[in-house]
Design a protein with these regions (language model features):
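Acidic/histidine-rich alpha-helical segments that form the ligand environment
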Residues: 23-51, 106-147
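Terminal low-complexity, poorly structured segments
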Residues: 16, 133-139, 161, 179
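Short, contiguous alpha-helical
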Residues: 1-9, 34, 45, 49, ...
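Short, charged, surface-exposed hinge/linker loops at domain edges
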Residues: 1-27
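Serine/threonine-rich low-complexity intrinsically disordered regions
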Residues: 13-16, 28-29, 55, 101, ...
Length: 192
């Protein structure tokens, strides 16, 4: 049985976490994690292609109070900076200012140098997002199996590398679900 990162289990609940683990979402080996990352990347590539067919202002629209498409990409920049940069690499380079934290972590925006009220253009956010996504793929390439069990001690806790990678894969998967749902609504609401 695959070991799922404890914060994910807490967020999803044990039954849902086990169900998703059974679908290969929470691999605990490099090959499985890299495969899940590639699958997420393919899903996002298709969805971003759909998004690029919309006027940029539509990608800044919120649906039912959820983040806009561009805000979701900004959040995924934050996710990568947190789990890969801060946790796995224990980087001191900091966060990209366009990263968007979840509401429960908004108190840390200032100390992390995040400009949550910024309104960068979609293509600028997409370029940063694509660079972060490529960086995750590079990290997966250079890790070896023993690295997965390394304990990382960033500023806010203690995590295994495998758990941090599971968190990134899960966030990418979950936010793709939300972004796709909302993009479908925007397409329907703004069809010619």
């Amino acid at each position: 049985m695959v070991s799922v990162h404890p914060p994910i289990v807490g967020f999803l609940g044990p039954e849902r976490a086990e169900e998703l683990a059974g679908k290969g979402l929470f691999a605990d080996d490099l090959e499985g994690l890299a495969s899940a990352w590639r699958t997420n990347g393919q899903r996002w590539t298709s969805t971003v292609t759909r998004a690029l067919a919309r006027p940029p202002e539509q990608l800044a629209l919120r649906v039912d109070g959820e983040w806009a498409f561009v805000e979701t990409l900004r959040h995924l920049i934050f996710v990568t900076d947190t789990w890969v940069g801060d946790v796995i690499e224990e980087s001191t380079e900091g966060y990209h200012p366009w990263g968007l934290p979840p509401d429960f972590f908004a108190h840390a925006a200032g100390p992390l140098g995040l400009a949550v009220d910024a309104t960068p253009a979609f293509d600028e956010v997409l370029a940063v997002r694509e660079a972060r996504s490529s960086h995750v793929a590079e990290v997966l390439e250079r890790l070896d199996p023993a690295d997965l069990q390394r304990t990382c001690v960033p500023r806010d806790g203690q995590f295994l590398v495998v758990g941090a990678l599971q968190a990134v894969v899960f966030e990418e998967w979950a936010h793709h679900e939300y972004a796709t749902r909302d993009l479908t609504t925007i397409e329907a609401d703004h069809s010619a």
